Amino acid sequence: MEELQGYLEKDRSRQQPFLYPLLFQEYIYALAHNRGLKGSLFYEPTEVFGYDSKSSLALVKRLIIRIYQQNDFLSVVNDSNKNRFVSHHRDNFCYSHFYSQMISEGFAILVEIPFSPRLVSYFEKKEIPKSHNLRSIHSIFPFLEDKLLHLNYVSDILIPHPIHMEILVQILQCWIQDVPLLHFLRFFLHKYHNWNSFLITPKKSIFVFSKENKRLFRFLYNSYVSECEFLLVFLRKQSSYLRLTSFGFFLERRHFYVKIERLQMQHLILIVVCRDFFQGTLWSFKDPFMHYVRCQGKAVLASKGTHLLMKKWKYNFVNLWQYYFNFWYQSYRIHINQLSNYSFYFLGYLSSLLKNSSTVRNQMLENSFLIDTVTNKLETLVPVIFLIGSLXKVQFCTVSGHPISKPIWADLSDSEIIERFGRMCRNLSHYHSGSSKKQGLYRIKYILRLSCARTLARKHKSTGRTFLRRLGSGLLEEFFTEEEQVLSLILPKKIPFTFYGSHKERIWYLDIIRINDLVNHS
């Protein structure tokens, strides 16, 4: 038990109780506004954060004054007579959508401070490892290609959202022990929920909050997901055949500043959970070939074990969410499939095992015989239907894939329109360069190219065919030249580019740190 307690010991280095006073500083909101205009650290578009020209220093000062005026509420939030705090006046600062957006973004900046690599390195007197900048999303696929070829079963897991925001606040208490800040967060979420309860049902409340306060919800959600992974790491470590002293796990942590390699448990309460719900079944998880990969809310669990073993892991996930996080999750939502007959969607690719059979003739003296061999290969394909659906959502084409103009871009200059469409094509080529077959990607590029021509034609009141003839190869170079130049440096000169590099060669890049926007829309 002492060893387990040491494994689950809290990390005190990140519990800095100095964040709440920063909520009353103007530069915090200026920083949040600047992040919103330029996109987040992960290069998200401006419209994600909902910032516009209405933000100003005067409004920030007015917000801080109102927070001061409402500050006396924080000391009595837990009072039994809560009805007196429920005001339905739209002018209340917590009910104002604009002010709540500012508070949400300012709070998101504050809670991210303890996880800044610069701050952590300052307190720990360590330099920031340069390898953190080299971790690419594409690095997951060579790992899958190396490991999945020898496994039997795979399970798609969609990590559910908690049904109540209070669960997320309780989890955050173990990461940041700034009591006033946590009280303010609880107060803010309570008021936000009461205001939206008149407009939406309680079941959709957390969904609406995640859409309107993406940055704050993303941090709270990642704290919750990390709890699931901490317990998963503990179970996997307990069930491992080899108890190495240097045993460690690497979990790809998206939307976190720090991607932790050697994890420590954050809650001593996990001891009780493990003892009460998992102690009697740990013996059944003796499987050295278990692999877990997650990005955002989608996880893949693969194993070389039996179907019964995968079912036991499945029900332990369900028990974890039911008994530890206190919300019901139906077991049928976790699908277990035989890897040889299944294609799973992960990180914008459809991945499956492709069996390649070959026959070798063996000659020994006067005798000869044939040897049939079967090898597995991980095939990664571009999900054309999903991408067309994403293009339809952002109005580049119809649901059936017919290109249309982009009216919202018609007011831009011609060069800006071409540059935007070209950048989208280059980003798609860059992200889906690991596809086994490129024909589907070429179809998406064709849709974008025609959409670009029709957007220009709409601006100049002409036809798309006219602009295609006018621009000719110039438009084609804007969409394809960069990819061709990159591949020409990598592939052998003797092999024709149009056949070998375009259709067969898979290339994984080491500089992709975020999922393509079209993949996120699908």
UniProtKB/Swiss-Prot annotation:
Gene Ontology terms: cellular component: chloroplast
Superkingdom field: Eukaryota
GO MF entry, a single one: RNA binding
This protein's record includes keyword RNA-binding: yes
Keyword Signal: no
Location of the protein in the cell: Plastid, Chloroplast
BP-aspect Gene Ontology terms: mRNA processing; RNA splicing; tRNA processing
Coiled-coil blocks: none
UniProt cross-references to Pfam families, sorted A to Z: Intron_maturas2, MatK_N
Keyword terms of this UniProt record: Chloroplast, mRNA processing, Plastid, RNA-binding, tRNA processing
Function: Usually encoded in the trnK tRNA gene intron. Probably assists in splicing its own and other chloroplast group II introns.
Family to which the UniProt record says this protein belongs: Belongs to the intron maturase 2 family. MatK subfamily.
Designated name of the protein: Maturase K
Annotated organism of origin: Iris tenax
Gene: matK
